[in-house]
Amino acid sequence: MNENLDPTTKGYNSEELDLEKRLRPLSFDDFAGQDQVLENLKVFVAAANQRGEALDHALFHGPPGLGKTTLANILANELEVGIKITSGPVLDKPGDLAGLLTNLDERDVLFIDEIHRLSPIVEEYLYSAMEDFKIDIMIESGPNARTVQINLNPFTLIGATTRSGLLTAPMRARFGISSRLQYYSTELLTTIVERSAGILKMPIDLEAAIEIAGRSRGTPRIANALLRRVRDFAQIKGNGTIDLEISKYALKALNVDAHGLDEMDNKILLTIINKFKGGPVGLSTLATAVSESSETIEEVYEPFLIQEGFIMRTPRGREVTEKAYKHLGKINTNIQGGLF
């Protein structure tokens, strides 16, 4: 996937990250989509505020770029508390987690992205913090070592994951709130594109906003990334306004087709068709064939390809669908051969 369109923020420079933050909604009122999730969260937050308690621990899961981090920040804003942000792979040992937990004020939010990647020892250390707001800390070492129990301020842990199936049952059970985020419709993404263009002070036509939204893989983060790149083309190759013509020109230059598939998406489909006769093919074999990691294919590319009906998962591996053949202008010889 084009680095600028990757539905993670990896590869973003400081300016891109600053723009990303500027475009993020800061309150429930600014957040578009995920209506049922949002309505439930409003109730939970209002109740917690009314009681003066910490919000129950919450888990957000779903494909990348749908608003998990944004919702964590919104919850902290709506609760009027502080938030500390970290990620599973960063927390190598219990001491890393203890440093964060002991510095949380009452009702603060601790957000752990990629929580499914916590090491088992750190995860187990988190259990007592989540349940009893207590942790054990080892004092000194050697024969003088002893354990001291420390009381924590009541806090809210918000976990985000793209792979909820990798969470252990004990961890999943400790979240009182669990919400799955869904892909966005073109209509909602159009609203998001128009809002973001307004923040960037960039004139945009409705037709252009619809075009960008339709190629954004149902993902707000990608919609905003595409908008920023189209803005560059409008500024240098156009008249400063994002219209339909410059949008199509820019999206073609970015190798983003009418379905929102980019170069790697189409490479995955073509590889399954040309090298594996349409499939089935195992994930690791496919990853080697397209020179991409299995994890990236499974987390970033595959969910949308399955959602849009280009790929099927079967017990024997991945297979492309008839829609993929038509999209790429290929003939499915497997079907033809079965007719004679």
UniProtKB/Swiss-Prot annotation:
EC number assigned by the record: 3.6.4.-
Q: Which residues bind Mg(2+)?
A: 69
Q: Which SMART domains does the UniProt entry name for this protein?
A: AAA
UniProt entry keywords in alphabetical sequence: ATP-binding, Cytoplasm, DNA damage, DNA recombination, DNA repair, DNA-binding, Hydrolase, Nucleotide-binding
Q: Which residues form a coiled coil?
A: none
Q: Where does DNA bind?
A: 313, 318
Give the superkingdom in one word: Bacteria
UniProt-annotated stretches for the region Head domain (RuvB-H): 258-340
Per the annotation, which location comes first and is thus the protein's main one? cytoplasm
The yes or no answer to whether the keyword ATP-binding is present is yes
Extract one GO BP annotation from the record: DNA repair
User: What cellular-component terms does GO give this entry?
Assistant: cytoplasm; Holliday junction resolvase complex
| Residues the entry annotates as binding ATP | 23-24, 65, 68-70, 131-133, 174, 184, 221
**Entry's localization field:** Cytoplasm
Name the Pfam families for this protein: AAA_lid_4 (PF17864), RuvB_C (PF05491), RuvB_N (PF05496)
Task: Kindly state the subunit structure of this protein.
Answer: Homohexamer. Forms an RuvA(8)-RuvB(12)-Holliday junction (HJ) complex. HJ DNA is sandwiched between 2 RuvA tetramers; dsDNA enters through RuvA and exits via RuvB. An RuvB hexamer assembles on each DNA strand where it exits the tetramer. Each RuvB hexamer is contacted by two RuvA subunits (via domain III) on 2 adjacent RuvB subunits; this complex drives branch migration. In the full resolvosome a probable DNA-RuvA(4)-RuvB(12)-RuvC(2) complex forms which resolves the HJ.
Domain-level remarks: Has 3 domains, the large (RuvB-L) and small ATPase (RuvB-S) domains and the C-terminal head (RuvB-H) domain. The head domain binds DNA, while the ATPase domains jointly bind ATP, ADP or are empty depending on the state of the subunit in the translocation cycle. During a single DNA translocation step the structure of each domain remains the same, but their relative positions change.
Q: What does this protein do?
A: The RuvA-RuvB-RuvC complex processes Holliday junction (HJ) DNA during genetic recombination and DNA repair, while the RuvA-RuvB complex plays an important role in the rescue of blocked DNA replication forks via replication fork reversal (RFR). RuvA specifically binds to HJ cruciform DNA, conferring on it an open structure. The RuvB hexamer acts as an ATP-dependent pump, pulling dsDNA into and through the RuvAB complex. RuvB forms 2 homohexamers on either side of HJ DNA bound by 1 or 2 RuvA tetramers; 4 subunits per hexamer contact DNA at a time.
Family affiliation: Belongs to the RuvB family.
Identify this protein by name. Holliday junction branch migration complex subunit RuvB
What organism, scientifically named, is this protein from? Flavobacterium johnsoniae (strain ATCC 17061 / DSM 2064 / JCM 8514 / BCRC 14874 / CCUG 350202 / NBRC 14942 / NCIMB 11054 / UW101)
